[in-house]
């Protein structure tokens, strides 16, 4: 099975610029392709996993990925899929974020000699001469055509800054630079990047007289069309300091029944026969498929050891087996005895704010050792400490252990 057939079967592909040509190209040659990642945060998140998995599938088939870190484009901010302008970051923040992205990418992509390339578009964008850029690149873009792009259409009513309007030119120029430097003939990205990718394909044709290609992927959404990887707390991050491996595991363990097969196909390397078998499970049996999904995605992102720990923690809490030591734990001192539960949990970062803690108690959603906390002013009592620990539960499924130091 060709890599294109694999990507189609698993449900990655949204659009392609030249489907038949791409099919022949990927079968006959080993190509260089790229995907861009603007380092606008200090960690990759679940939404990036589709691009990462596609790169990994392509690399396994012998093609060479370029991971392009947007050290230059992040200074502008991509308006695609945005209803408002992104917060402007400093160059120092972007450089720090790019370094974090780089380390995370190495978990998924083999960067050994000749296998893959890591680049940063700051290398060529930051030194551009504005007049020369307009004469050399800007001349090939018509404003009429640019305004037809979905990314700009959705922003015209609310206001699109000239800064953001330049983003398409910058991304197209990236593709041209990578074509010239590395013979990169294909750009891939999320489906919200379609207009920007086409702009790059056309720029290469106009400047070099050569054919380049584009491919976009589906966005990671639930069966209800909502973005996957978002919770009440915010994004599900790939950095274990921002989202613990246990929280990460639990997110996948608790996704909707209708989303299990899609997530298994897109976010694991399990054979499709197994994916389909797991996807056919119903009622209580679907929980087995969710456990497989949670373990496989956690293993991919955090490694097998952390995935096993998360699995054991979940078993300890929800099935009465396993080991409590793997449940997310926070050390606290003995002087918590007699203090308000809300204050202690806020200081231990179990709740984001004291008002959120009070709201949780009023709604009957906070438990200490599986006993509901009834009063917002309730204090920690000595008898709550069992074997030097207090088990805290928020809602139905979020657990934390407070380890009381002697």
From Swiss-Prot:
Annotated keywords: Aminoacyl-tRNA synthetase, ATP-binding, Cytoplasm, Ligase, Nucleotide-binding, Protein biosynthesis, RNA-binding
Motif ('HIGH' region): 39-48
Keyword Lipid metabolism (UniProt): no
Binding site for L-tyrosine: 34, 167, 171
Keyword Iron-sulfur: no
GO CC terms of this entry: cytosol
Biological process per Gene Ontology, one example term: tyrosyl-tRNA aminoacylation
Cystine pairings recorded for this chain: none
Pfam hit, one: tRNA-synt_1b
GO terms for MF: ATP binding; RNA binding; tyrosine-tRNA ligase activity
Motif ('KMSKS' region): 227-231
InterPro entries assigned: aa-tRNA-synth_I_CS (IPR001412), aa-tRNA-synth_Ic (IPR002305), Rossmann-like_a/b/a_fold (IPR014729), S4_RNA-bd_sf (IPR036986), SYY-like_C (IPR054608), Tyr-tRNA-ligase (IPR002307), Tyr-tRNA-ligase_bac-type (IPR024088), Tyr-tRNA-ligase_bac_1 (IPR024107)
Cellular compartments annotated: Cytoplasm
Bilayer-spanning residue ranges: none
Catalysis: reaction(s): tRNA(Tyr) + L-tyrosine + ATP = L-tyrosyl-tRNA(Tyr) + AMP + diphosphate + H(+)
Biological role stated in the UniProt entry: Catalyzes the attachment of tyrosine to tRNA(Tyr) in a two-step reaction: tyrosine is first activated by ATP to form Tyr-AMP and then transferred to the acceptor end of tRNA(Tyr).
Family according to the record: Belongs to the class-I aminoacyl-tRNA synthetase family. TyrS type 1 subfamily.
Subunit structure: Homodimer.
Entry protein name: Tyrosine--tRNA ligase
UniProt lineage: Bacteria, Bacillati, Bacillota, Clostridia, Thermoanaerobacterales
Gene that encodes it: tyrS
């Amino acid at each position: 099975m060709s890599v294109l057939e694999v990507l189609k079967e698993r449900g990655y592909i949204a659009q392609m610029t030249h489907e038949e040509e791409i099919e022949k190209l990927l079968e006959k040659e080993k190509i260089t392709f790229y995907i861009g990642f603007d380092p606008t945060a200090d960690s990759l998140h679940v939404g990036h996993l589709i691009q990462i998995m596609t790169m990994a599938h392509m690399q396994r088939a012998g093609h060479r990925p370029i991971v392009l870190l947007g050290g230059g484009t992040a200074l502008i901010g991509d308006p695609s899929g945005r209803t408002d302008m992104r917060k402007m970051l400093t160059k120092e923040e972007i450089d720090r974020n790019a370094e974090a992205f780089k380390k995370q990418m190495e978990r998924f992509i083999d960067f050994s000699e000749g296998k893959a390339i890591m680049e940063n578009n700051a290398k060529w964008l930051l030194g551009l001469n504005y007049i020369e850029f307009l004469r050399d690149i800007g001349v090939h873009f018509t404003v009429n055509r640019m305004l037809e792009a979905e990314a700009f259409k959705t922003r015209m009513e609310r206001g699109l800054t000239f800064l953001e309007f330049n983003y398409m030119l910058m991304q197209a120029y990236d593709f041209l630079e990578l074509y010239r430097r590395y013979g990169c003939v294909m750009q891939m990205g999320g489906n919200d990047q379609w207009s920007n990718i086409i702009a790059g394909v056309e720029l290469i044709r106009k400047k070099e007289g050569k054919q380049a290609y584009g491919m976009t992927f589906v966005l990671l959404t639930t069966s209800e069309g909502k973005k996957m990887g978002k919770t009440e707390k915010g994004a599900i991050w790939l950095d274990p300091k921002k989202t613990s491996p246990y929280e990460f595991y639990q997110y996948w363990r608790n996704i909707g029944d209708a989303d299990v097969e899609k997530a298994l196909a897109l976010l694991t390397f399990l054979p499709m026969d197994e994916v389909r078998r797991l996807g056919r499970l119903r009622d209580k049996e679907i929980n087995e498929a969710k456990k497989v999904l949670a373990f496989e995605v956690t293993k991919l992102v955090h490694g097998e050891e952390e995935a096993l720990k998360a699995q054991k923690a979940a078993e300890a809490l929800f099935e009465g087996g396993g080991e409590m030591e793997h449940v997310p734990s926070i050390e606290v001192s003995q002087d918590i005895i007699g203090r308000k539960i809300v204050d202690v949990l806020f200081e231990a970062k179990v709740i984001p704010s004291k008002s959120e803690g009070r709201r949780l108690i009023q709604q009957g959603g906070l438990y200490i050792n599986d006993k509901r906390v009834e009063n917002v002013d309730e204090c920690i009592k000595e008898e709550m400490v069992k074997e030097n620990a207090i088990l805290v539960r928020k809602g139905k499924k979020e657990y934390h252990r407070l380890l009381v130091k002697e």
